[in-house]
Amino acid sequence: MRHGQVALAALCTLLFLTFLDNTVVSVGLGSLQTDLQASVVQLQWVIGAYALTFAAIMLACGMIGDELGRKKVMLAGAGVFCAGSVLCALAPNAPVLIAGRAVMGLGAAASEPGTLSVIRHLYTGTRERARAIGVWAAVSGLALALGPVIGGLLVGAWSWRGIFWFNLVFGLAALIAVAVTVPESADPTAARVDIAGTFFGAGALAALMFAIIDAETAGFGSAEVISLLGVAAVLAAAFAAWERRAAHPLLDLRYFRLPRFTGPSIVAFCTYLATFAIFFFTALYLVEVPADSGYQIALVFAPMSVLMIIGSLAAGYWTGRAGPRWPVTAGCAAFAAGLLIACPLITPHPDYVPLALALALAGAGIGITVVPVTAAVLDAVPPQRSGMAASAVNTSREIGAVAGASVLGALVFSRLSATLNSHIAALRVPAGDKATILALKPLIIQVIETGQVNKYLNRYSGQGGLITQVEGAAYSAFGDGLHAAFYLSAALVILAGLLAAVTLGRAPAGPLEDDPVIS
């Protein structure tokens, strides 16, 4: 048992790193934006490239691990993750950084599925296995919670590059720990990798993300965006058709007929999408507008992280006693309430204590949902399909992160552009100055998107009060976009909570080995 606990610790260290990188970079976005002259679209890709590659091949990597050996694939993935971290840490520009993040996502996708599969192999007793899976689920929530705090401390002490050197050091430590403590396991009867399904699914997801992000500059009516949306639709249809007829599908779509499988998968998607609104845009706004340091942002997010951890621990106990239905519903309610309370508090001159407390309430809600959502999906399938189920819910989470990077980003900057006119019109300046400012609107938006506001303010400091008013108008428009993202996120989380209340049973469901869907 002691050896099993040591191996579990090694596996959870690797899991922690792969999930940490969903949020740890968010606090460093303002710093790297200034350093690399990156646009907001490029920042979206810094986040989205990791989530996209993670989500696109996670299920396939799980199948490869089952066939070739889970430990081998995990170690290979950890090595790729470390290589991507080095590429990011040394990146001279935004495109190289985005490429490095994509490489890290590939490594994470190869590493993560095996962590759960090996746990099922190590712990043969039902009770011990359940406890180990509970630890596994809690660690993923812990990583999500601590990301902004760790990122803020690293950025404050060094720079955004410190985040990736941190990844390298702990990635190598996790690789060595897994190599030494985790036994090899494989399934000699495992199905061959569904290459066609992987291609169709990954292609559809990538085309959709490219389309939405490209629409921010080209518009949804542009030929390029329409073509990408068409490609995404065709590939998605091909994926569904292939998976229905494949002998060993990448994702058994029959399970989506079960509300208790589909419901928590949708909740996972919505909560990760909404989490992106907090970690990406709040951190970016605080860096760019009040010009907070990494340490200050870490302090703002610290109460949220603590409440996420407490919520996750409490949810494990609550779910064990009452099932996943009400913990998920309550968690979504707390998450949405935190978003709605925090929204008006995000201003150019924020009151940090109320903002931190509102984000802490949202964090408690996020923490409460993590464990029961995973438990609900695992309860909906027989034990031999738990690996697929866990990978499916994690894929839903990563797709939510991809959607957050693309959809919310498009919303924020379309709203910024739409409201900037009204804010400029409200300025108390001569009509001629207003006309000049309106003519410079594209430049103002570009300055906000590239984090160069202070640079341009200094350049035109001789304009006195006029430039100060322009600054206020620009930041107010940016705030309008951020608020729109928060309101949309809160609405999605509320709908997810209602869905959980309807689809999840009142008590923990047993493994559905006799379910007709599995025939």
Residue spans for each PLM region:
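Transmembrane-helix bundle of Major Facilitator Superfamily
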Residues: 1-180, 315-316, 322-324, 343, ...
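Helix-loop junctions at the membrane-solvent interface of multi-pass transporters
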Residues: 61, 83-91, 157-158, 180-184, ...
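Small-residue-mediated transmembrane helix hinge/kink sites in multi-pass secondary transporters
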Residues: 30, 62-63, 151-152, 209, ...
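Generic alpha-helical transmembrane segments of integral inner-membrane proteins
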Residues: 52, 56, 79, 83-87, ...
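Transmembrane-helix exit segments and adjacent C-terminal regions of multi-pass membrane proteins
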Residues: 1-11, 15, 375, 438-519
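Transmembrane core module of solute transporters
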Residues: 7-53, 159, 196, 224-228, ...
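C-terminal module of multi-pass small-molecule transporters
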Residues: 8-10, 57, 69-78, 94-99, ...
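Hydrophobic transmembrane-helix bundles of small-molecule transporters
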Residues: 134, 156-268, 274, 292-295, ...
